Amino acid sequence: MKLNKIKAIFPAIALFLTASMTSCMDDLEKGNIDPTVEPNPNLLGLYSKCYAGLIMEGNDGNADFTIDDAGKSTLLRNVFNFNELSTDEAICWWSDGGITDIGYNQCMPGTATLRFLYYRLMSNITYCNHYLSLEAAQADKTMLAEVRFIRAYNYFLMLDFFGDPSFIETITSEVPKQAHAYNEKFDESATYTRAELLQLGREFLFNWVKKELENAEADMLPAEPETDSDANYGRADKAAAWILLSRLYLNAGTYLNNDGQNNPHWDKALEYAEMVINSNYAIFDDTRIPTEATQRGYRPYDLLF
């Protein structure tokens, strides 16, 4: 199988999600969208907020939750920290907020940076739950599908980073249960080790995210590249669902049986990756940058990041 192709396109999802914010910025000043304060917010403002949670700290420079530094609350920053600083790919010279713990893979429940990632993901999920619960939101199936995709992406990150997080799909005052409690294999009368509960949570979230993405994909926009002059620029389309499904299947060995070497879903990972590769999207390579930029020594990576 051409699994090397899969690796080549995964960085595109981060770029896509970052670009997704461009068309939503003007819609954030739409009044209060906190479900505990305003049960019927401006629909477009809340829809935009679901996208904004992928890249922004908050609407006005402050974070969406209590934190000493709003910049530490952003999703992209925290995803980078835990994906890269925990390896030999990157190192951070400062030590506040538990950054050093990430570098040494010694994070504890009290590690500040770990809590910031969890708070951000749960905040994003709450905004999506609020939007999806509104009767007025049901009228536009495409926007509804996009928010389902965004929520599924946040839960995918919960699955990937935490395994057995709290799980909730609605706006409620009830204390949410952890994901393992929703696995049909879970028996409340039985005794489990923490590792067993973790695996039950992973299995449940894997199947839930997969189903959500499959259902959302049907109503999402066609997989077509857009420019900033197009009305749908920055909106998640079918290709976003495909690449996330590919990523989900790629790690299914760990999510389903805690064995990264025994993955029954390699073919599905390849199938969805090739759907993106064979779509009208293309890698941003040397043929797509201005001649002047090439003459000055710029590479595609430099212009993107």
Model-derived features: where do they sit?
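Acidic, serine/threonine/proline-rich low-complexity intrinsically disordered regions
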Residues: 171, 181-199, 243, 254-271
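Conserved, well-structured interaction surfaces
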Residues: 44, 48, 57, 91-165, ...
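Polar, glycine-rich mid-to-C-terminal structural blocks
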Residues: 253-254, 270-305
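Bacterial Sec-dependent N-terminal signal peptides
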Residues: 1-32
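Short coil/turn linking the two alpha-helices of tandem helical-hairpin repeats
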Residues: 159-161, 166, 251-260
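Membrane-proximal, proline-rich intrinsically disordered regions
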Residues: 24-77, 287-293
